[in-house]
C-alpha cells in the first residue's frame, strides 16, 4: 500500500494502473465521518495506491477523477483523458438542447 502525497501524481498513476489491466483494477472511496477523512484507493491486487484528504475542496477533484474513470471504462483504456472534464462540460451540452424553435 502506497499513500501518494500529490493529487496529480495519484491521478496519473491511477490512470496508468487502470490502463495496464482494466479488467482487474478497482476504485474505492471511503469516508470516515468520525475523523473527517476521505480515502481514495485504486488497486489491481498487485499494486495499491491510496490518497488521503480532509479538505472539502478535494471533492471537485474527486468528481473529475470519477469522470476520468467513467470515460476509461466506457470508451476503453486508450481514450484521451485530456478532453474529459467535470460537470461544466455536461452542463454546456445540456444547455444547448432545447434552444431554438419547435417545428
From Swiss-Prot:
SUPFAM superfamilies: Signal recognition particle alu RNA binding heterodimer, SRP9/14 (SSF54762). Pfam families: SRP9-21. Residues 81-103 are annotated as: Disordered. GO terms for cellular component: signal recognition particle, endoplasmic reticulum targeting. Its main location: cytoplasm. GO terms for biological process: negative regulation of translational elongation; SRP-dependent cotranslational protein targeting to membrane. GO terms for molecular function: 7S RNA binding. InterPro entries: Signal_recog_particle_SRP9/14 (IPR009018), SRP9 (IPR008832), SRP9-like (IPR039914), SRP9_dom (IPR039432). Keywords: Cytoplasm, Ribonucleoprotein, RNA-binding, Signal recognition particle. It comes from the Eukaryota. It is found in: Cytoplasm. Component of the signal recognition particle (SRP) complex, a ribonucleoprotein complex that mediates the cotranslational targeting of secretory and membrane proteins to the endoplasmic reticulum (ER). SRP9 together with SRP14 and the Alu portion of the SRP RNA, constitutes the elongation arrest domain of SRP. The complex of SRP9 and SRP14 is required for SRP RNA binding. Heterodimer with SRP14; binds RNA as heterodimer. Component of a signal recognition particle complex that consists of a 7SL RNA molecule and six protein subunits: SRP72, SRP68, SRP54, SRP19, SRP14 and SRP9. Belongs to the SRP9 family. This is Signal recognition particle 9 kDa protein.
Amino acid at each position: 500500500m502506497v499513500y501518494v502525497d500529490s493529487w496529480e501524481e495519484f491521478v496519473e498513476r491511477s490512470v496508468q494502473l487502470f490502463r495496464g489491466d482494466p479488467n482487474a483494477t478497482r476504485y474505492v472511496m471511503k469516508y470516515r465521518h468520525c475523523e473527517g477523512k476521505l480515502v481514495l484507493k485504486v488497486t489491481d491486487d498487485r499494486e495499491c495506491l491510496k490518497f488521503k484528504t480532509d479538505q472539502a475542496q478535494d471533492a471537485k477533484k474527486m468528481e473529475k477523477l470519477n469522470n476520468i474513470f467513467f470515460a476509461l471504462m466506457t470508451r476503453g483504456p486508450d481514450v484521451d483523458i485530456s478532453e474529459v472534464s467535470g460537470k461544466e462540460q455536461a452542463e454546456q451540452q445540456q444547455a444547448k438542447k432545447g434552444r431554438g424553435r419547435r417545428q
